[in-house]
Amino acid sequence: MSRTSLTRRSLIGAAAATAFAPYVKPANAAAGPIRVISHRQPALEYYTDQMKKALPEGQVSVELMPIDKEVELASITMSSKSDAIDVAYLNDTTMQKFAASGWLEPLDDLWAKYKAEFKLDDFPKSVIDSISYNGRIYSMPILTNTEMFFYREDLFKESGTALPKTMQEYFDAAKKLHQGRVSGTVMTLKPVDGCLNESHWYLNAIGEGWFDKDWKPIFNQPAGVNAITLMKQMTAFAPRGFTSAANDESTINLQQGLAAMGLQWFTRAASMDDEKKSRFVGKINWIAPPGGGQRIANDGYAISKYSSKDKNTIFRMIATAASQKSMQKGAEFAMPPRLSVLDDPELAMRYRWYPAARASLEVGKPFPPMSDFLDVGAIVTRYILQAVTNEKEVKAALDQAAQETTELLHSRGYYK
């Protein structure tokens, strides 16, 4: 799309923006416009347009591009300590890497200063955790995604099965509903991403997480062993090929009635009610995952440490884009991270999975705030898959994963 052409959604967003964008102190025109770089997709087109509307015309420059190009440009610019970029769109994993490199402006003081004005306490703790590194906030949350618990409401009612609140109740329900062509639960264990997400849930809901406060692995301790042992037992009720099942495969299994329940992303909920894709429209419902601790992911906008523009002005600009009224409209494009928006009755009528999304946000957990976590995940998931497929005993597999994780983190300076 050219810079002069707009999608219908962009036009709608632009028309709505002036109705609720609070006035923000103009940037210093002599210093040039605030430069924002961002990934291109409908939701981000909308939110970057809100940034442009937050300041007088010409005070904000927005450049939209593919995510790989945007991250590359931000990396090159910030690593050279250039002030050529003021604001960059970053997902939570990339934000961790940039914050660890010292390229981002900590936002804690600005957050406290403008907390009341922009109702920043409307973001749940799980979202704040996902935009923080070493206890400091580095990004304004814009888009969020959470895993939720999908279930066939008709099967639960017909069998008199109570909705699970704990992982043991989840196991019992999966065992009970595992009949005929219907598997008890989906399990998304394709490496690395699928298995890492599923393991994250088990290790938080049953175990004590991944690391202690000094980044020493604890997933091989008794609670972690119990978590992965239950995960192994649960595979008896999963569809065939669960070790190669990614999100697409698990989504299809739910849509086609080949599984009674399981963990999947918020972004997959709408397809359950799509008559062209789902055979069970209106029969699938959602709750927060049993035990909580499932993965949430959050994307936002961070301020470059090297920006020469007024940081108060920049912060107010991105806070305007992330305001309650802005996200009320933005909910048309993507899940908003504000609880007040997810509570909106009108939105709940339009998107019946929103109440479960809100409940899931409150109990979810982001990946550990470690810039090297995906490398850790590649190690650990390899051994978890060996454990759940009986190639190794669970304890032995997790011990080996912990040893290799410790060696990796030691080589990267995590331990004194």
Predicted regions and their residues:
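Short helix-initiation/N-cap motifs at beta->coil->alpha
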Residues: M65-A74, M167-F171, F242-Q255
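Glycine-centered hinge/linker elements that transmit conformational signals in sensory
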Residues: A174-L177, D214-T243
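C-terminal lobe and pocket-closing loops
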Residues: T267-F280, P290-R382, Y414-K416
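Short, solvent-exposed loop/beta-turn-alpha elements that line the ligand-binding surface or hinge
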Residues: D108-D122, L189-K190, I206-N226, D274-R279, ...
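Extracytoplasmic/periplasmic solute-binding protein
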Residues: A21, Y133-I142, E147, F171-P217, ...
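Hinge/lid segment of periplasmic solute-binding proteins
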Residues: T93-T146, F171, E198, V281-N285
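Conserved N-terminal structural module of periplasmic/extracytoplasmic solute-binding proteins
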Residues: S2-S101, A112-F118, L163, T243, ...
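Paired acidic/hydrophobic, glycine-rich loop segments that form the ligand-binding mouth/hinge
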Residues: D86-Y89, A260-W265
